[in-house]
A protein has these predicted regions:
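Conserved beta-strand hairpin/beta-sheet module of binuclear metal-dependent hydrolase folds
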Residues: 1-33, 37, 141-156
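Metallo-beta-lactamase
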Residues: 26-40, 44-56, 71-131, 136, ...
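Metal-dependent catalytic neighborhoods of phosphoester/phosphodiester hydrolases
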Residues: 58-69
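Divalent-metal (often Zn2+) His-rich catalytic cores of metallo-beta-lactamase-fold enzymes
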Residues: 122-125, 143-145, 150-151, 161, ...
Length: 198
C-alpha cells in the first residue's frame, strides 16, 4: 500500500533438507533478494498475510537465529492468520500433519507478532482477506483495491492458471466441493468486476 509494505505468503523458506527439496522440486530463491529488487528489506515489511499455514506458503515466516532457534523473518511485521487456521495447524491429524511445520509459525506467537482474525476482514485501506475454504478449512484469499482497480491473490484456491476452469481442483484439497463453490463465487465476481487474478 502507499504507507505499509504488505507481503502475501512467504514461500517455503530454507528449512528443508536436500531430500525435502527434491521431493517437492523446490528451487530456493531467497525472499530477501526478491524484496531487494522492489527496494524493500525484510525489516521494512509491516504486515505478512498468510493465505494458510502450509509449509509452501508459510515456510519463510521464520528464520534460524545464531543459536539454532527460529525467529520471525520479518521482525517488524504483524502476521495475519485466520484463528481457526492457527488452531488446525497446531492440532493436526494424520492427513494434515505433513503440511504444517510448527517452526514456521509457533515462534511468531512467542515473539508476540501474530494477529488472529475470523472470516472476511479489511486489514488496511485497500487490503482485505476473503475466507475461501476448500484447499483446507481456513484458506483465505487477499483482495487488493486501488482506485477503481481490483486484484485478488488466490493462493491455493486457484494455484495455477491451469486450475481456473471450475472443475479443475487439486487432488489434495481437503474439501473439494467447497473449493468449487468458492471458485465460483470469487471467479464470477472477478469476471463481473474485471479483477486481476494473481
Amino acid at each position: 500500500t502507499g504507507k505499509k509494505n504488505i507481503l502475501i505468503d512467504t514461500g517455503t523458506g530454507d528449512k528443508g533438507n536436500d531430500k525435502f527439496k527434491d521431493i517437492y522440486a523446490i528451487e530456493h530463491k531467497p525472499i530477501d533478494k526478491a524484496l531487494a529488487i522492489a527496494g524493500i528489506s525484510q525489516s521494512e515489511v509491516d504486515i505478512v498475510i498468510n493465505t494458510h499455514l502450509h509449509f509452501d506458503h508459510a515456510g519463510g515466516n521464520t528464520i534460524m537465529n545464531k543459536d539454532g532457534g527460529y525467529i520471525p523473518a520479518f521482525p517488524n511485521a504483524r502476521y495475519i492468520i485466520q484463528k481457526d487456521e492457527w488452531f488446525d495447524a497446531i492440532n493436526t491429524n494424520e492427513k494434515t500433519r505433513a503440511s504444517y511445520r510448527k517452526d514456521d509459525f509457533l515462534p511468531l506467537q512467542e515473539a508476540g507478532v501474530v494477529e488472529l482474525i475470523e472470516g472476511d476482514r479489511e486489514i488496511e485501506k485497500g487490503i482485505s482477506v476473503l475466507k475461501t475454504p476448500g484447499h483446507n478449512r481456513n484458506h483465505q484469499c487477499v483482495l487488493i483495491e486501488s482506485g477503481d482497480k481490483k486484484a485478488v491473490y488466490l493462493g491455493d484456491l486457484v494455484p495455477t492458471a491451469s486450475h481456473i476452469p471450475l472443475p479443475y481442483i487439486m487432488g489434495y484439497d481437503l474439501f473439494p466441493l467447497e473449493t468449487l463453490e468458492n471458485k465460483k463465487r470469487i471467479l464470477n465476481k472477478a469476471a463481473d468486476e474485471d479483477w486481476l487474478l494473481i
